[in-house]
């Protein structure tokens, strides 16, 4: 599929939002969700790349992602299925990645968990994402997040968090993190906070984790102060109540 030039995509989205401005909600923590996507249109049954495609942008008013406030989620480390592998499409927002995640999601839900913590597809030991989000951990005062190894999505919210954290003076390491390292940190008390990052939720705090019969609680099951600060800052920048020195927002 062709790559849409950034200036053309932004111009199109801007005009669409202006056209549909009556649908922009004004209540606290609500938003107009914008989703660009592209589909192949070749009228053929064979398996091959598309020569014709359509670029579409849809918008939809959405309510507060956390209507009752930020609540930490319980996550289950998935060591059977994988969402993507290096050399595949894990670094892209493709529908196939979601399809590969459904069975594990059902299994986690059946065990009382709300999200899946994905491991890599080769060694089945290194953490990659949580649900459909990037993931970060505060361990011994340092921020750790899986590196972009070809099967991890280079999320915009992830990038924004890294920028903010560095500006706040935190050391951020992008590297391989094993599930064993994470659980050892939780068990010895050095895992201070954990959260997912993504467009819809912005920040999703993690309160409990389960893996191979082990169960750990993060920060007493409460939202950490840094997790909350990231959420408040990002949402504040989106709403214009916090300064935006990075030029992340466009005022229409």
State each model region's role.
Residues 24-39:
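Extended, Lys/Arg-enriched charged tracts that mediate electrostatic binding to polyanionic substrates
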Residues 21-25, 48:
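Active-site loop segments of alpha/beta catalytic cores
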Residues 2-3, 8, 12, 16, ...:
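Helix-start/capping segments and mature chain N-termini
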């Amino acid at each position: 599929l062709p790559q849409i030039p950034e200036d053309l995509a932004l111009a199109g989205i801007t005009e669409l939002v202006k056209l549909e401005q009556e649908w922009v909600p004004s209540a606290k923590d609500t938003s107009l969700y914008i989703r660009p996507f592209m589909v192949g249109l070749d009228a053929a049954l064979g398996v091959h790349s598309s020569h014709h495609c359509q670029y579409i942008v849809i918008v939809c008013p959405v309510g507060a992602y956390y209507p009752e406030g930020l609540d930490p989620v319980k996550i289950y480390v998935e060591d059977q299925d994988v969402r993507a592998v290096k050399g595949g499409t894990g670094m892209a927002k493709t529908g196939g990645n979601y399809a590969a995640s459904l069975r594990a999601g059902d299994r986690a839900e059946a065990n009382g968990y709300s999200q899946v913590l994905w491991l890599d597809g080769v060694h089945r030991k290194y953490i990659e994402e949580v649900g459909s989000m990037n993931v970060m951990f505060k361990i011994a005062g340092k921020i750790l997040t899986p590196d972009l190894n070809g099967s991890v999505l280079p999320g915009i919210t992830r990038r924004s968090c890294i920028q903010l954290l560095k500006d706040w003076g935190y050391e951020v390491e992008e590297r391989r993190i094993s599930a064993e390292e994470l659980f050892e940190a939780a068990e010895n008390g050095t895992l201070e906070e954990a959260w997912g990052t993504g467009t819809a939720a912005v920040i999703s705090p993690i309160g409990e984790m389960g893996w191979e019969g082990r169960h750990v609680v993060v920060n007493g099951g409460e939202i950490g102060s840094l997790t909350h600060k990231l959420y408040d800052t990002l949402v504040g920048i989106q709403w214009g109540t916090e300064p935006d020195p990075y030029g992340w927002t466009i005022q229409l």
